[in-house]
Swiss-Prot record:
Keywords: Periplasm, Sugar transport, Transport. Belongs to the bacterial solute-binding protein 1 family. The gene is malE. Involved in the high-affinity maltose membrane transport system. Initial receptor for the active transport of and chemotaxis toward maltooligosaccharides. Disulfide bonds: none annotated. It comes from Klebsiella pneumoniae. It is found in: Periplasm. Its main location: periplasm. The keyword Transport applies. This is Maltose-binding periplasmic protein. GO terms for cellular component: periplasmic space. It comes from the Bacteria.
């Protein structure tokens, strides 16, 4: 679930 959160913080 880091991929989804990563794109959100990006």
């Amino acid at each position: 679930l880091k991929d989804a959160q990563s794109r959100i913080t990006k």
